[in-house]
From Swiss-Prot:
This is Glyceraldehyde-3-phosphate dehydrogenase 1. It is an enzyme of class 1 (oxidoreductase). Its EC number is 1.2.1.12. Moderately thermotolerant. The gene is gap1. One of its GO terms (cellular component) is cytoplasm. Signal peptide: none annotated. InterPro entries: GlycerAld/Erythrose_P_DH, GlycerAld_3-P_DH_AS, GlycerAld_3-P_DH_cat, GlycerAld_3-P_DH_NAD(P)-bd, Glyceraldehyde-3-P_DH_1, NAD(P)-bd_dom_sf. It catalyses: D-glyceraldehyde 3-phosphate + phosphate + NAD(+) = (2R)-3-phospho-glyceroyl phosphate + NADH + H(+). One of its GO terms (biological process) is glucose metabolic process. The keyword S-adenosyl-L-methionine does not apply. It comes from Streptomyces arenae.
Length: 333
């Protein structure tokens, strides 16, 4: 069965999701996108990407549609998600990637329009279920869960890092810092912003700011609820981020034991979600990788303190998790 997908919001994540689906999934079909931008601009930004390069097929704009190779994708321009004709288009799952409709009550408008399920590409409020693949996807219940949050890009990396370490040696408490690429929420030049640090020029500064990843961990790993705290350092790179997790463990361990746990996870149950690397990487090395990467060489143990580091492409990796999640949900429709 081919699962029919609608994308609401054709920005960085929406276009990355489109590319990820085109690159690797014959089980999913993108049938429509909704965005208030004009069609020629949307087609151009899909065809030419500053990070991912040229789209591998010809992309052209048509009246009310984008043509990609021999496929035609309908383009809608509705402000109100409840007015979208998902039912008429036969859409099974909507990927909500505007960053606006993160409240489940608003996202549910897609269901009112005929979609069967909604995946919110962000942390959400009031959702039926928040999922990090490899951590709690086994708890997904198609009968009870209609509005599903895919958490954040950082939570997807942190969740796997924390789960593997917690299963191996037990986590008592910890701190996480994500050194994160700048995003559209920041300013190109100094300008007003509700977060006065994010008000500063993104390409010129290291910008300390908040991260909701620690709170979200409690949703996907309830045994760690309230045990982790976190913040972010936004840095002047366009994509490619790294999570530094430092914890107090419940028992003594060694660098070798920690590495062995991650090596086993990467070659076993987390294959495709987590890779194990010994090479001395920098951020550009992981751009375009769909998995999070455990950097074995940065592992440290000092008494009861353990530090582990995981890289992730905050755009491409997260978009691939959205495709994985849509495939999982689609398998039980």
């Amino acid at each position: 069965m081919t699962v029919r997908i609608g994308i609401n919001g054709f920005g960085r994540i929406g276009r990355n999701v489109f590319r990820a689906a085109a690159a690797r999934s014959s089980e999913l079909e993108i049938v429509a996108v909704n965005d208030l931008g004009d069609v020629p601009t949307m087609a151009h930004l899909l065809a030419y990407d500053s990070i991912l390069g040229r789209f591998p097929e010809e992309v052209t704009a048509e009246p009310g549609a984008i043509r990609v190779g021999d496929r035609t994708i309908k383009v809608l321009a509705e402000r109100d998600p409840g007015a979208l004709p998902w039912g008429d288009l036969g859409v099974d799952i909507v990927i909500e990637s505007t960053g606006i409709f993160t409240d489940a009550a608003k996202a549910r408008s897609h269901v009112d329009g005929g979609a069967k399920k909604v995946i919110i590409a962000a942390p959400a409020s009031g959702e039926d279920f928040t999922v990090v693949l490899g951590v709690n996807d086994g708890d997904y219940d198609p009968e009870r869960h209609t509005i599903i949050s895919n958490a954040s890009c950082t939570t997807n990396c942190l969740g796997v890092l924390a789960k593997v370490l917690h299963d191996a040696v037990g986590i008592d408490s910890g701190m996480m810092t994500t050194v994160h690429a700048y995003t559209q929420d920041q300013n190109l030049q100094d300008a007003p912003h509700k977060d006065l640090r994010r008000a500063r020029a993104a390409a010129l500064n290291i910008v300390p700011t908040s991260s909701g990843a620690a709170k979200a961990i409690g949703l996907v790993l309830p045994e760690l609820a309230g045990r982790l705290d976190a913040f972010a350092l936004r840095v002047p790179v366009p994509t490619g981020s790294v999570t530094d997790l430092t914890v107090t463990t419940r028992r003594g361990t060694s660098v070798e034991e920690v590495k062995e746990a991650y090596a086993a996870a990467a070659s076993g149950p987390y294959k495709g979600l987590l890779s194990y690397v010994d090479a001395p990487l920098v951020s550009t090395d992981i751009v375009g990788d769909p998995a999070s990467l455990f950097d074995a060489g940065l592992t440290r143990v000092c008494g009861p303190q353990v530090k582990v580091v995981g890289w992730y492409d905050n755009e491409w990796g997260y978009s691939n998790r959205l495709i994985d999640l849509a495939t999982l949900i689609g398998s039980s429709l």
